[in-house]
A protein has these predicted regions:
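Cytosolic regulatory regions of ion transport systems
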Residues: 1-139
Length: 139
């Protein structure tokens, strides 16, 4: 699995879990004209996203049928803060046997290793990203 896939070659995205991180990703992708489908279990959040003209649906990302709903997407970004739900969502997507590019949020190095073993293409640990950004700002 490669972590260096050109974004230009990917046109359809699913964002599973749309808190502040997922929302920022969705807005950036939308601004670039990408086709984005957002799945979140918070009905209020989904309504707010729809009010912003984003394609959002209410569902629990850990449910098996979500993998079916997003089966046609090139890229799956699993951005929930619920790490167990993220692991379950990744399992369901990979069990379908597709070749979707999966980016997932982790909370620590152990979780990152577990997600990598599940077949994730890229693991992001927000704490590490923030630390790296802070250190770069000091340079």
């Amino acid at each position: 699995m490669s972590s260096a896939v050109p974004m230009a070659s990917m046109s359809t995205y699913a964002i599973l879990g749309c808190g502040s991180v997922g929302h920022a990703v969705a807005e950036q992708l939308e601004s670039e004209g990408k086709d984005v489908l957002i799945i979140d279990n918070d009905e209020g959040r989904v309504e707010a996203l729809r009010d912003q003209d984003l394609d959002a649906r209410t569902a629990d990302i850990a449910e098996t049928d979500v993998a079916e709903v997003i089966a046609d997407r090139d890229v799956v970004l699993v951005m929930s803060a619920d790490i167990e739900a993220n692991k379950t969502a990744v399992r369901h997507v990979r069990e379908r046997g597709g070749d979707q590019f999966i980016v997932v949020r982790a909370s620590d190095p152990v979780t990152a290793d577990e997600l990598t073993e599940l077949g994730v293409d890229v693991v992001i640990n927000p704490s590490e990203v923030i630390a790296d950004s802070a250190l770069r700002a000091l340079e």
